[in-house]
């Protein structure tokens, strides 16, 4: 899992404000297909916003981060923001 400094988290949160949630953790939880989609989205975009379903445990957001080796940048309500540096970095994080 990627460790982020407070400055990096603030930077990523500001970038994430304009993003639409692309994925949703539904009642099926962290299915293999969901995790695969999240892996692809993280590799492609590095920063991914995910909706957490109404009847889903919020701990699944943390579990999804560890299973995909991503950093859980922030959670706000039922939305989680994930970051993982891709092989070809797109975002230039501050130090």
Spans of model-derived segments:
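Positively charged, polar, low-complexity stretches
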Residues: 1-95
């Amino acid at each position: 899992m990627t460790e982020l400094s407070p400055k990096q988290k603030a930077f990523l949160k500001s970038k994430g404000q304009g993003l639409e949630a692309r994925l949703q953790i539904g009642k099926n939880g962290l299915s293999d297909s969901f995790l695969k989609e999240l892996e692809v989205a993280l590799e492609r975009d590095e920063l991914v916003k995910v909706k957490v379903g109404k009847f889903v445990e919020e701990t699944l957001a943390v579990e999804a981060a560890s299973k995909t080796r991503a950093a859980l940048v922030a959670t706000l309500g039922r939305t989680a923001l994930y970051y993982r540096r891709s092989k070809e970095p797109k975002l230039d994080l501050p130090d």
